[in-house]
Amino acid sequence: QKCKAMLVPHYFGLAKSLKEVRQWCDDRGIALIEDCAHCYFGQAGERAVGEWGDFSTASLSKFFPLPEAGLLASAHRSIKSLRLEKPSLKAQLKGCVDVIELASRYQRFTGIRPFLASFFKLKNIRSQQPGVSEVVTNREASEMMRDCDMARIDQAPLWAAMALKTALPRGRIILQRQINFARYATYFSDVLGAKPLFPIHENSVASAAPYVYPLWVDNPDSIYQALRAMKLPVFRWDRIWPKTPDLPGDIGPLWSHHVLQLLCHQDLNTADIDHTARAVLHLLKTQQAHRQPFST
């Protein structure tokens, strides 16, 4: 009775119709916030992504090569202009440099990449820290917040983020993510020890731009550690916020442990997908061999 708003996410970039949820909220006078953090493009059933909610939120940096930027939108209500502070000139320049550094790291700027690599290597020497384990285990809240600068919430996005959002084409992003998802699906349709989190069929992503391919693994820990050690584009939600309540029927803890998320990013090509998928299959096969006794 005290509920004023409900937040409903489209997980993994695989948007679903929110028709029943929308009706449930309307019947009770509850505002629906459509969480599109994983899902920037496509259809969610009868409506476009972001059009079910009274408000919708999205994360641009998950789909575009941006240093930052989130989105608040509404297909039904007016949104007052936010009075955001302009970032400092230093922050603006750093944002531009960060974009160039990331592009150089992923084989962009072919002609001048050696020069850029040397420059960024020198730049980063001062900020290098001792390595940490690739597998994160139950950090305290203060540690988890180190990568989250909440002092920025009153500041406008950087020039670099807004310029790239406006200039970059959408078609290639959508198509390559669909291709990558479909490629993963060919590997994991019938595998011992793992299965797609959701049923996959020919039209699963025909109207979507997938964020990841969610793969349920029965015994994930050793496999995940090996994949992370190989620096493959795979992750899972293994950071659960301290004091998160344990709610009946909540599948979040199970997913955070068992669901490996195989990235479908548009800059991953078929060879990248094949390499990652085959590594997963090899680890699964090795695991199964160790678990099952040999016949004599």
Label each PLM-derived region with a short phrase:
Residues 7-9, 80-296:
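PLP-dependent aminotransferase class I/II
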Residues 1-84, 89-90, 265:
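Active-site phosphate-binding strand-loop segment of PLP-dependent enzymes
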